[in-house]
Structure formats: structure tokens, C-alpha cells
């Protein structure tokens, strides 16, 4: 049986809850995109969805070398955006301490990072660079900070940015991949080798297809990435 693709247009055409696959009584959280290019794309989560999402993000953090003894400073935005609450849940799931900073308020970010001894920073790569410059301008010696790992995503970044972040903050900078339409961050992640993305294939089954024939391409060929995922609350099988 061939299944049709679900696209962002389908989510918008069925705004807000037309693609929900469970009763609203089973949906315990709702996230949505900003809606800057159209109606927001809305995704609901059951308790099982939240648990599996936290597990996927936990794997990313573990692959970065983080663990129970770490202090996570989560500087992604909290709210409808998935980054803040997603990273928060993943860090708590491995037993780490979490500072729910959210984005902005850079001066306080630096103060608490310094005073609390944050060891893992979660934010966008562009904000990490901004923080690095702000720390330098603050006059606080870099050696007084305990940061060792950065989990960066939610926007494109380059290897040059990675090297600049690592040099300025004295950390290892890792990419975390996701998309809000099928949960959020944690679909894929780097490991300590920093040489490509590992996918949580027991939760998100990837295929690369020819957009014209809709058939899988041969290894090494360019195509469109689609995911079939195990999310209970929303029907998007597979998502293109």
C-alpha cells in the first residue's frame, strides 16, 4: 500500500487540529511555528510523544559526552518554539541539572553561567557567538567559566562558525537536528567525532526520494529527505 506524503501545506490547510490522530483529551501539550510565511504549523503531543521526544534528545546529549554531573544552561526560547522545552526535557531525562534561562538577557546569561558553573550551553549557534563576544567584553576571564559542550541548532551554521565558537568559548560545539512538524530537536545529532548526523531511526525512519518519481534514490544521489515517524498525536506519515 502506497501512503501519501504529508507536507507543511497539509498542516496549514488543516489548521489547527485537523490532522490530530487522537482525541484532544489525550494531547497534553501543543507547539506551533511562528507563522511568518502563512498559518502556523501546529503539532500536539501525547504523554508518550513527550517521553519519546525526551529520550531522543537525551541520546544526543549523551553522544556529546554530557551526563548527570553536568549543568545545562538552556538558552533556546521557551514557549511555542520547541527548542527550549525540548532541550530542557532531554537534559532532565539524563539526570542533569537544568537552568531554564530561555533566550535574551545576555548580561544575566553570562552572570549565571559564571556563578552557577554551567557546563553545557543549548542555544542557536549565532547566539553562542554573540555570547562569546559578550563574555569577552564583560572582562570576566574565560578560565573562570566551566563550559565544555555546546548543543546548537534551530538555524543553519557552517564549519567556520563551529571553529569560531569552539575557539572563543573553549568548548566542543555539536549540531542537533530536528523540525517542529515531527516533534522538534532530537531527530538527529552528532557524536564526539563531529563527522555527520546520527538519526534516531527507531523513532524517525528516513528516506531520500526523487521528488519527481517519488521513489527512493540510489546511494550517493541527491533527493528530498522524508521522514516516517512514530508520533501518536498527529498524522504525518511520511512527512516531506
What do the PLM-derived regions correspond to, one by one?
Residues 1-32, 37-55, 59-63, 68-69:
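Nucleotide 5′-phosphate-binding alpha/beta core
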Residues 20, 37-40, 79, 180-182, ...:
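Gly/Ser/Thr-rich beta-alpha loop segments that engage phosphate groups in nucleotides
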Residues 28, 56, 86, 108, ...:
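Short Gly/charged-rich anion-binding patches and loops
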Residues 38-52, 88-98, 118-122:
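Acidic/glycine-enriched edge-of-secondary-structure segments
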Residues 42-46, 66, 83-86, 111, ...:
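Short, conserved acidic/polar surface loops in the N-terminal third of protein domains
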Residues 50, 77-79, 126-127:
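Short glycine-enriched loops at secondary-structure junctions
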Residues 58, 62-98:
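Conserved AMP-binding loop of ANL adenylate-forming enzymes
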Residues 94-240:
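Active-site glycine/GP-rich loop and adjacent strand/helix microenvironment
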Amino acid at each position: 500500500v502506497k501512503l501519501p506524503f504529508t507536507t507543511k501545506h497539509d498542516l496549514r490547510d488543516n489548521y489547527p487540529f485537523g490532522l490530530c490522530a487522537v482525541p484532544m483529551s489525550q494531547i497534553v501539550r501543543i507547539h506551533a511555528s511562528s507563522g511568518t510565511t502563512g498559518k502556523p504549523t501546529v503539532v500536539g503531543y501525547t504523554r508518550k510523544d513527550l517521553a519519546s521526544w525526551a529520550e531522543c534528545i537525551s541520546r544526543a546529549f549523551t553522544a556529546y559526552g554530557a551526563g548527570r554531573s553536568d549543568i545545562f544552561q538552556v538558552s533556546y526560547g521557551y514557549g511555542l518554539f520547541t527548542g527550549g522545552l525540548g532541550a530542557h526535557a532531554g537534559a532532565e531525562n539524563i539526570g542533569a541539572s537544568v537552568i531554564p534561562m530561555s533566550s535574551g538577557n545576555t548580561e544575566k546569561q553570562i552572570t549565571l553561567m559564571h556563578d552557577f558553573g554551567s557546563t553545557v550551553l543549548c542555544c542557536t549557534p549565532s547566539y553562542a557567538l554573540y555570547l562569546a563576544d559578550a563574555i569577552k567584553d564583560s572582562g570576566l576571564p574565560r578560565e573562570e567559566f566551566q563550559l565544555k559542550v555546546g548543543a546548537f541548532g534551530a538555524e543553519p551554521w557552517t564549519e567556520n562558525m563551529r571553529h569560531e565558537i569552539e575557539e572563543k568559548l573553549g568548548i566542543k560545539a555539536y549540531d542537533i537536528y530536528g523540525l517542529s512538524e515531527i516533534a522538534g530537536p532530537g531527530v538527529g545529532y552528532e557524536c564526539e567525532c563531529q563527522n555527520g548526523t546520527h538519526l534516531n531511526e527507531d523513532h524517525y525512519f528516513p528516506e531520500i526520494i526523487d521528488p519527481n518519481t517519488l521513489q527512493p534514490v540510489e546511494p550517493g544521489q541527491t533527493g528530498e529527505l522524508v521522514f516516517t515517524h512514530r508520533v501518536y498525536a498527529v498524522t504525518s506519515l511520511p512527512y516531506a
